[in-house]
Amino acid sequence: MGRNYKWLDKDMLTPRQLKLFNYLKEYKKENNYMPTYKDMMKYMNIKSSHGIHQMLGYIEWKGYIKKYPAMARAIEILKEVA
């Protein structure tokens, strides 16, 4: 049996990626700015900022968001989940 590489499917988000993506949208809607990595870590119950960084990287690679690394909380939603 082969491995399941759903996280590499460029057309869809994994359940955890979708959970983070929806959190970003709701947080932005309620606060008019994006959450910090610490906020995301708490929401996703992840102990390391590297886990959030990696998950955001895959969501960006799939074309749902754009990160602007030189600015704090600079994440732009590019498209909605179908």
What do the predicted segments below correspond to?
Residues T14-Q17, N31, A70-A82:
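Short, cationic-aromatic polyanion-contact patches
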Residues K19-E26:
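Pre-recognition alpha-helix immediately N-terminal to the DNA-recognition helix
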Residues E26-N32:
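Short helix-capping/hinge SLiMs at alpha-helix to coil transitions
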Residues L56-G57:
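Short, hydrophobic-biased segments on the C-terminal half of alpha helices
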Residues E60-Y68:
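A short, conserved structural fragment
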